[in-house]
Curated annotation (Swiss-Prot):
Disulfide bonds join C290-C302, C296-C310, C372-C394, C376-C382. Gene3D superfamilies: Bulb-type lectin domain, Phosphorylase Kinase, domain 1, Transferase(Phosphotransferase) domain 1. Belongs to the protein kinase superfamily. Ser/Thr protein kinase family. One of its GO terms (cellular component) is plasma membrane. It comes from Arabidopsis thaliana. Glycans are attached at N85, N113, N203, N234, N240, N255. GO terms for molecular function: ATP binding; calmodulin binding; carbohydrate binding; protein serine kinase activity; protein serine/threonine kinase activity; ubiquitin protein ligase binding. Residues 341-422 form the PAN domain. The modification Phosphothreonine is found at T653. This is G-type lectin S-receptor-like serine/threonine-protein kinase At2g19130. It is found in: Cell membrane. It catalyses: L-seryl-[protein] + ATP = O-phospho-L-seryl-[protein] + ADP + H(+); L-threonyl-[protein] + ATP = O-phospho-L-threonyl-[protein] + ADP + H(+).
Length: 828
């Protein structure tokens, strides 16, 4: 019995000694689970399972053993385990892996294709904090297969190399935690770029701080001059043909220091103060918290002088209060009450003074604060506005407000920011309390009545002034006038002078009291007229461009819907191109035609690229290009237009437009992009060159589909002059311009929309800024190449006033080969 107890005690003591002794290695017969850890041989670093803060999740991580737990590296950042006791960190199948629960589910792995046996591998936590997976043996003879220094987390330890692989262009990154209790990769990262500068990025794309390039003479980064005063670190930069990296060591090994890509979005340098038993913030960039991009998220307000730095404005609350408590403000703020745009009186604007204005604004040409406010009030998508007195710019925000900052009172660079709120969320600043002083109450009542009477008088005068101003046509600021039906009835002399008509109504000439001419479109048809009315007001009501027809105002009284435009004395382009022998009009010369083509392209480029939303016109044709007194082209008739938000690339809509100008994707029924307008423009450009409809019979009475004929001439180096309108004989026709126009037109009508140029590229080509390559033959028109056989075409037009000719333009869905359109490496 004694012998048995003695033997049992011996084994217990041996087991206890083995279990309590610190080891630095995980090998085939030693794993980590529960509270087990490994410790570097010098006792500096420790590794095992940990739980951040009050989180219920467990991770495998490394920390300083002798200091308060400061996590330096995490293996399974992306996926936590729920139970540390049933989870195992071990070597298996040539890898270091983490298994969650009963050895079944792999959570993390080194991801090697190793052929080494388990018994030949070991994972060692070295004295520098590097976890190394290597073949067994001494540190000198061992072969390192994987090391944690090549996979940094949020902390940069001495000896770690944040490198750039010049062969692949990829850089290692320090990436912040998502929050104080969530080590998964956050939104902020530090990386090295090709200019030898370190930069901090938001979401891997938006740079908001840079160290500047490395200066080998002074051994500092150009934008970090304080490195000259450093007495703690020895910085080193290395660069060769394959990679570049920056690393550092510490002069005094007794000092404990680290760099961290913090959840705040700042790169921070900490040193340990042994006397205080605390970390000291030695250096950080950006210096100001509010310089961090999107730190407070959407609609959040940042202030460098408050704690916490982020707050939500009036009428908003944190998207996630739990995340905000953990200093993760990235989700931003959400409205307490959603906006309702059906009634303008239930939305108001809340005034935020002395603000550094948010990013992602759009600039409107407005001349005063009141006009700017009116423009935003009238646009349901406008979430906020501000007026910059210095530059006389009206700034509006139609998307989420980002990087809004509250400036200090002594800072005079701030602006007043007006944020749209539901009226129920706007505080009643007037109802601050009651008074028992009857005299004060009586005086206040009398004063209020006096103010009300004065305000009413001012309002009446303003309304009279505005009415007179509107009737004089003084709306140069770009805002829309609301006309009464009687006013337009008088202006058009009871709609007596009809200019034309179409599927949606008729157009009449009129004059305002100041004798300025206008064109009034009276929309007809209850449903279609209402739809076109809304579409035109939304699309062109708030935009201005020299090549877009200007909408001056509107009338909406019950079923009566009218639109008021500037009058175009030279009518539409088709009336000058497609002349019959009876009509006596001036034939447009080539220079004028080319300027019309260029101006139209500029107008479309503005619609596609420079408006708040991409506007697809959907019905580009000569009938919808109006000419002013100087023959300056104006894109008109936006009744079929579609708006596409900048977050989307295409829109699914019903087929619309005019046959003969329709892109193939209209017929196939797929979602369209702005490239549908490009196709229509290409067809119209051919008609500008030829002076006739694309399907009109030629002089020798053989039916020719002009685009196929022009494509044949272009691809076979034929006579370009033969494509020009014969009525221009004797006119100074610039063949180089004709060639450029025909080439770009042929590119515009390619079957695959990805092969067509953007309208901005078309403008550059016509201006001669870009050289254009020979286009491929569009496959959908190859069947229409000129032959001896008769080809019958049929045309339908949305405008009954157009000079219709019959055509039946059949499109093929076959694609053309992808080619470069220009010589500047920009693809069509």
């Amino acid at each position: 019995m004694v012998s048995f107890l003695t033997l049992t005690s011996f084994f217990f003591i041996c087991f206890f000694i083995h279990g309590s002794s610190a080891v630095d290695t995980i090998s085939g017969d030693f794993t980590l689970s529960g509270d087990q850890t490994i410790v570097s041989s010098d006792g500096t670093y420790e590794m095992g399972f940990f739980k951040p803060g009050s989180s219920s999740n467990f991770y495998i991580g490394m920390w300083y053993k002798q200091l308060s737990q400061t996590i330096l590296w995490v293996a399974n950042r992306d996926k936590a385990v729920s139970d540390k006791n049933s989870s195992v960190f071990k070597i298996s199948n040539g890898n270091l892996i983490l298994l969650d629960g009963n050895y079944q589910t792999p959570v993390w792995s080194t991801g090697l294709n190793s052929t080494s046996s388990v018994s030949a591998l070991e994972a060692v936590l070295q004295d520098d904090g590097n976890l190394v997976l290597r073949t067994g043996g001494s540190s000198l003879s061992a072969n390192v297969l994987w090391q944690s220094f090549d996979h940094p987390g949020d902390t940069w330890l001495p000896g770690v190399k944040i490198r750039l692989d010049k062969r692949t262009g990829k850089s290692q990154r320090l990436t912040s935690w998502k929050s104080l209790e969530d080590p998964s990769p956050g939104l902020f990262s530090l990386e090295l770029d090709e200019s030898t500068a370190y930069k901090i990025l938001w979401n891997g794309s938006n740079e908001y701080w840079s160290s500047g390039p490395w200066n080998p003479q002074s051994r500092i980064f150009d934008s970090v001059p304080e490195m000259r005063l450093n007495y703690i670190y020895n910085f080193s930069f290395f660069s060769n043909t394959t990679d570049s990296y920056f690393t550092y060591s510490i002069y005094n090994q007794l000092n404990v220091s680290r760099f961290v890509m913090d959840v705040s979005g700042q790169i921070k340098q900490f040193t340990w103060l042994e006397g205080n038993k605390a970390w000291n913030l030695f250096w950080s960039q950006p210096r100001q918290q509010c310089q961090v991009y999107r730190y407070c998220g959407s609609f959040g307000i940042c202030s460098d002088k408050s704690e916490p730095f982020c707050r939500c404005p009036q009428g908003f609350r944190p998207m996630s209060q739990k995340d905000w408590d953990l200093k993760d403000y990235s989700a931003g703020c959400v409205r307490k009450t959603e906006l309702q745009c059906s009634r303008g009186d239930i939305n108001q604007f809340f005034r935020l003074p002395n603000m550094k204005l948010a990013d992602n604004s759009e600039v409107l040409t407005r001349t005063s604060l009141s006009i700017c406010a009116s423009a935003c009030q009238g646009d349901c998508s406008c979430k906020a506005y501000a007026y910059d007195e210095g530059s006389s710019k009206c700034l509006v925000w139609s998307k989420d407000v980002l990087n809004l900052q509250q400036l200090e009172d002594e800072n005079s660079e701030g602006n007043i920011f007006y944020l749209r709120l539901a009226a129920s969320d706007v505080p009643n600043v007037g109802a601050s309390g009651k008074s028992n002083n009857k005299g004060l109450i009586f005086g206040a009542v009398l004063g209020s009545l006096g103010v009300i009477v004065l305000v009413l008088l001012v309002v009446i005068l303003i309304l009279r002034y505005r009415r007179r101003k509107r009737m004089r046509g003084e709306k140069g600021d770009g805002t829309l006038s609301a006309f009464s039906y009687r006013e337009l009835q008088n202006a058009t002399k009871n709609f007596s002078d009809k200019l034309g008509g179409g599927g949606f109504g008729s157009v009449f000439k009129g004059a305002l009291p100041d004798s300025s001419d206008i064109a009034v479109k009276r929309l007809e048809g209850i449903s279609q007229g209402e739809k076109q009315f809304r579409t035109e007001v939304v699309t062109i009501g708030t935009i201005q461009h020299v090549n877009l027809v200007r909408l001056r105002g509107f009338c909406s009284e019950g079923s009566k819907k009218l639109l008021v435009y500037d009058y175009m004395p030279n009518g539409s382009l088709d009336s000058h191109l497609f002349l019959n022998q009876v009509e006596e009009k001036i034939v447009l010369g080539w220079k004028l035609r080319f300027q019309i083509a260029l101006g139209t392209a500029r107008g479309l480029a503005y619609l596609h690229d420079e408006c708040r939303d991409c506007i697809i016109h959907c019905d580009i044709k000569p009938e919808n290009i109006l000419l002013d007194s100087q023959f300056c082209p104006k894109v008109a008739d936006f009744g079929l237009a579609k708006l596409v938000g900048r977050d989307f690339s295409r829109v699914l809509t019903t087929m619309r437009g005019t046959r003969g100008y329709l892109a193939p994707e209209w017929i196939s029924g797929v979602a369209i992009t702005a490239k549908a307008d490009v196709y229509s423009y290409g067809m119209m450009l051919f008609e500008l060159v030829s002076g006739r409809r694309n399907t009109e019979q030629s002089e020798n009475e053989k039916v020719r589909f002009f685009p196929s004929w022009a494509a044949t001439i272009l691809t076979k180096d034929g006579d370009i002059r033969s494509l020009v309108d014969p009525r221009l004989e004797g006119d100074a026709v610039d063949i180089e311009e004709v060639t450029r126009a025909c080439k770009v037109a042929c590119w515009c009508i390619q079957d695959e929309e990805s092969h067509r140029p953007a309208m901005s590229q078309v403008v550059q080509i016509l201006e001669g800024v870009l050289e254009v390559n020979p286009p491929p033959f569009p496959r959908s028109i190859q069947a229409l190449v000129v032959s001896d056989e008769d080809v019958v075409f049929f045309t339908e037009s949305s405008s009954s006033s157009s000079h219709n000719s019959s055509q039946n333009h059949k499109h093929s869905s076959s694609s053309s080969s992808s080619k470069k359109m220009t010589n500047d490496n920009s693809s069509a």
